[in-house]
Amino acid sequence: MGASCIKENSAETINPQKPVIIRAKTSKDEMKIFKSKMISLHNELRRKYNSPDLLEDNNLNIEADEYADNILLNEPQKSNVYANGLYGENIIVIDKKEETTIFNKWADEEKNFDFTKKKYSKDASHFTQIIWKETRNIGIGFSYDVFNKIYCIVVLYNPPGNTLGEFEMNISK
């Protein structure tokens, strides 16, 4: 009989063939700093495009954590976020949890957006979600897979952006 793994901070047994995920790799203080920096980076870019600052939403943080867990477990459909599609999202799976690197991967998509046409572009969708004017709240979550040594960072936005037909009023330069 194979060994089973315990998800840290719970009594839930995880199938040993699946990734082993934890949040304890980062302390609460480190996570608070990470979230604060990510929100600051978002708001700095949003101000450049005349979008109001985002406010952190603890309920979205919880949803984002759950979604990150399920993504690393290859079960995103088990997340309420995946099922209901109520939020915008930016997601990355990466080996280092460095705010600026993560954020810049999304923000650098600005070069792919045509500000004259203001239409949805898959190649700029992370960027346009970040600066979407109607979005007011943000939630940030993550999971760490100790076996594969990767993080899943999930950023949720409410209300969601990238709504077809609404680019003209939500994106400005």
Model regions and ranges:
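Short clusters of hydrophobic/aromatic residues that line enzyme substrate/ligand-binding pockets
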Residues: 54, 91, 130
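Terminal export signals
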Residues: 1-16, 132
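Well-structured core secondary-structure elements of compact alpha/beta domains
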Residues: 89-95
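Generic secondary-structure boundary/loop-capping signal
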Residues: 42, 51, 88, 112, ...
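Short, well-ordered surface patches within globular domains
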Residues: 20-87
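Disulfide-stabilized extracellular recognition modules
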Residues: 20, 97-173
